[in-house]
């Protein structure tokens, strides 16, 4: 277990319905090769791409409220990553934290196919921790986690897709 990570396996109800709804209704940005993206809430600049303000969908507002109640902050942005299948991946990285409100981190809600989230210690790269992220789960990382660990979504042997809803409170 990593200090600064909160993991809740069954955080939301009906993750399969939400997966199908978002997959079909979101206008996906396809500028990234490895995955499709979308952003809701406060304007956000991510990986040299600008996402303008877009109002939260009601389904995202419900999750926002639950994060506020459970973790203790109300996100104002949700960056969504859609991994179409197991070939879609994300390499080791730390998220940008200087744009986050003090005392907040990043909450990730997973829907669709279960995937692994691997953490690698920046100072001791051989220290790797793995969290399984089934549909409906939440993993929350404090800013301190980002300073000590990098995380990645490795390739997986599946034809099914996964959507990660990454909630932040941007300054």
What are these regions (language model features)?
Residues 1-171:
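Non-heme Fe(II) oxygenase metal-center motifs and adjacent flexible, charged/small-residue loops
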